[in-house]
C-alpha cells in the first residue's frame, strides 16, 4: 500500500465524529479534575470554618459541586461505552 492509501484508510478510522467524541471526552476529564480540586478545597475550608452560616453556605456549594461531578462522571462513562462500540 502506498502512503496515500494508508492516509485515506486512517481518515476513515478517525472520522470527524470520532475526533469530536475524543475531544469531548478529554475536555470533560479536565473539568472533572478541576471540580475535584475545588471540592477538596471546600472540604478543607468547611473543616476550618466555625461560623454556622458560613458552614451551611460552604456545604451547599459542596453539594452543588458534587452533583456536577456525578453528572460529569456519568457522561464520561457513556462516552467511554460509546468509544468501545
Residue ranges of model-derived segments:
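Secondary-structure edge/capping motif, primarily at the C-terminal ends of alpha-helices
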Residues: 14-21, 42-50, 79, 83
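Charge-rich, solvent-exposed alpha-helical interaction surfaces
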Residues: 6-9, 27, 61
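Alpha-helix N-cap/helix-start motif at coil-to-helix transitions, marked by capping-box chemistry
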Residues: 1-4, 29, 33-37
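Short, charge-rich amphipathic alpha-helices with coiled-coil/heptad character
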Residues: 1-21
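Short E/K-rich amphipathic alpha-helical oligomerization segments
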Residues: 33-56
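Short, charged, amphipathic alpha-helical segments
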Residues: 29-30, 55-64
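Amphipathic alpha-helical coiled-coil segments
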Residues: 65-82
Amino acid at each position: 500500500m502506498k502512503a496515500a492509501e494508508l492516509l485515506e484508510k486512517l481518515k476513515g478510522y478517525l472520522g470527524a465524529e470520532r475526533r469530536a467524541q475524543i475531544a469531548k471526552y478529554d475536555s470533560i476529564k479536565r473539568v472533572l479534575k478541576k471540580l475535584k480540586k475545588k471540592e477538596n478545597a471546600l472540604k478543607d475550608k468547611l473543616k476550618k470554618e466555625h461560623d454556622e452560616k458560613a458552614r451551611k453556605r460552604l456545604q451547599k456549594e459542596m453539594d452543588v459541586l458534587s452533583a456536577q461531578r456525578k453528572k460529569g462522571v456519568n457522561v464520561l462513562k457513556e462516552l467511554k461505552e460509546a468509544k468501545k462500540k
